[in-house]
């Protein structure tokens, strides 16, 4: 099938009729129609609470990272220490992280957090201190109250699906999450029992009144 990716196109409105989304509208007033809609807005998913009449309890959790330049194949394996880790890349870089902070949508890296990351990483591999740091940055993780993502049909809507709230495991769980959601939408046998991920959890004492 033909697939078109439309970048830099923030969506601002669901057009809901009789429990079904007929279309969505972007900030530039463009209207998009589809048979099924999937919410994959990560840390920003709570934005849809009012429109969908649901309290979506997904919050941003900041994580900071540091990137080293090392020789290729210098570090042969991933290392972990408490909540910190070292991940070698094929191009000779080593990713070091990561922190956790509840500071809203702030993505400003700080010197203090950098030092905390470095201390933990040098404890694992002291030799890493000999190599240059090429980058420090901060991102946002979508945290759910239990750490379990929401994957499946949204409550009270016939054609809206959730795939958000993966917290620290978005990249790791992404392919399996997409596969599971595809199976649910197409009513195919699922690779695992989807009950634990079901968005019906959003209706448990959290519906707005």
Kindly label every feature range from the protein language model.
Residues 125-209:
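C-terminal catalytic lobe of FAD-dependent flavoproteins
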Residues 19-24, 74-76:
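Short, hydrophobic/aromatic-rich segments at coil-to-beta transitions
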Residues 3-4, 160:
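Short, conserved active-site loop motifs that form the nucleotide-linked donor/cofactor pocket
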Residues 7-22:
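A conserved short coil-to-beta-strand element within the FAD-binding core of flavoproteins
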Residues 27-29:
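Glycine-centered tight beta-turn/hairpin loop motif at sheet-sheet or coil-to-beta transitions
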Residues 4-6, 134:
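General small-molecule cofactor/ligand-binding pocket signal
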Residues 23-25, 95, 161-162:
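General beta-strand recognition
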Residues 31-32, 36-158:
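Active-site substrate-recognition segment that forms the wall
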